[in-house]
Amino acid sequence: MSKIRVYKLAKELGKSSKELVNILNDLGVEVSSHMSTVEDETAELVKGMLQEEDKPEEKISKKEPDKKDRKKTKGKKQMTRTATQKEGTEHGQKDTDRREMRVTVNPPLSVKELAEKADIPVNRIIKTLIGLGVMATVNHQIDEEIVKKLIDKMNLKIKISQGEDKEEKPDKVQTDIKDKPEDLELRPPIVTVMGHVDHGKTTLLDVIRETRVAESEAGGITQHIGAYQAVVQNKKITFIDTPGHEAFTAMRARGARLTDIAILVVAADDGVMPQTVEAINHAKAADIPIIVAINKVDKSNAQPDMVKQQLTEHGLVPEDWGGDTICVPISALKKKNIDELLEMVLLVAEMEELKANPDRPAEGVIVESQLDKGRGPVATVLVKNGTLKVGDPILAGYTHGKVRAMINDQGKRIKEALPSTPVEVLGFSDVPAAGDYVQVLEDEKEARAIAEERLQKKQERDLQHDGRISLDGLYQQIKEGGVKELNLIIKGDVHGSIEALRESLVKLSTDEVTVNIIHTGVGAINETDVNLASASNAIIIGFNVRPDSNARKLAEREKVEIKTYRVIYKIIEDLKDAMAGMLEPELKEEVTGRAEVRATFKVPNVGTVAGLYVKEGFINRNNKVRLLRDGVVVYEGDIASLKRFKNDVREVKEGYECGLGIEGYNDIKEGDQIETYTYREIKRTL
């Protein structure tokens, strides 16, 4: 017998999927979501019943008893709960003692650690997580939001730490405003498009912007502010058009959600790639629904079934394969099935029941920020709740201000922004950080006082010993009981090396500390890796790869340790020594200069000479040299020659050009990166 999906039946009946799920459950038909199926016979019965209910005479007589029944049921549930509570208290002091003995946890933490704290088997937690749609292993890191769900679902006798150590970054200011259910209204969903480089994220966003924004705003000029709104079936969808934006991870570090839905773009000819896995991990960690857009299906070598198979290996089972992950085959270039994809976004949003209260002071998130020469500090704010108005006193992280002007994604000045609306805001005292909470307070004086107090506390914290984990201080932190889990992110040049390294490092776990690999990937160390390390208090291990310029700067700012190696056993040795507290004084590598190869020349009897432009530091004739191609180390050796014009020189500084030859190596190509370095002897302290 054929079947029909709930959302399709809801469409035919002119009802929302949520309403139909409730109706079917009331009738005793077991369905869990809009993707569940019902038999045609059941569908016909439901159609007939609803048509009968729609008759004017019977409408009142049928609906009234339903309400009473619901009230009775609610009453019964409340009575049962009260009775249970009474029974519990009659058992004397036992329950009170249990409540008092609640163990405190400080997310993010591993499944194994949570099981130990809660004193329950690990497999019970894993089973419950699967029920919540989270595919996790023993060493999988779970954030605060998921821990809360587990506490509610499993009635765990644990509580989440609210201590000072948790308040590393400024959070929301607590207010007395409570949102009443009757004040809440449906708001547009906020969507992030994620995926691997060159899989079509930008093309998809451009197509949606061109077609849907142009339709809604005739003659409107689209302005790039980091987010925009599209109109589909007279409903708005907010897109964050900076894929893989650091705000996504910055918000996850505080256990909050920036987006409601993630569209994962996977190329049908390429399949699941390292950044695809990275995106899946981020979306799962943030606990948001994923819609997969299988792009480039118009290509002759497209293999959508291969993509679906690969997705199942990462816990995303397509709905046509019996799972609950929506997969839509599209071609962003040829604008094929874009409307169907957007319909699925609206469908998931409907099931999520996204609501906000527009009649309250606004709260939101900084998506992008910059210092504009003419306008001063400018930030794109995504309003999450309330309505942001011109003249509102605002607080965001360590900055404050007053909304002087607001510009929407069409480049028009507006006076107020409703929930889920992205706006460019002028009036901050300083440039806020991406991912900071934005709040409207009573007056500007209060906002200034809180911002100054936060800044002072941050400066005091920075002066104290930094709590970030490093190999040098690892043994001392283990001894003091400060470390129970060593989180690592591994980046390498090839998959085989990464897997070999992963297996070797996990075996180093001891009774005092568990080695937990939270993410692996092929390619150069980037900002996303540093953000993830910052959020998870992890060390980044690079094998035959180096961090890019932005990642290095971010790591310095976030105090994330990046260790790079050429030999696997050296990584294992260092970790063993760090964990055993036997770190010997070592030679520390110091990068002295970075340059770009802009041309190459073949010189008889000499070999290939690279024409360089020095971008950072200086190139010294006596330093070691490293050649990088696409972030991967290709060769390391000595400098054979260094010239300015025709003269041999000892040193060339930043901003100058020079010619450089590498001892015993000629395969230099235009676009390669050159790093020069020296070794400095440093004494390790614990």
Curated annotation (Swiss-Prot):
Annotated stretches, region: G1: 195-202
Organism of derivation: Halothermothrix orenii (strain H 168 / OCM 544 / DSM 9562)
Region (G3): 241-244
UniProt keyword Hydrolase, yes or no: no
Matches recorded under InterPro entries: EF-G-like_DII (IPR053905), EFTu-like_2 (IPR004161), IF2_II (IPR044145), IF2_N (IPR006847), P-loop_NTPase (IPR027417), Small_GTP-bd (IPR005225), T_Tr_GTP-bd_dom (IPR000795), TF_IF2_bacterial-like (IPR000178)
Localization terms from the record: Cytoplasm
Region (Disordered): 35-99
Name the record gives this protein: Translation initiation factor IF-2
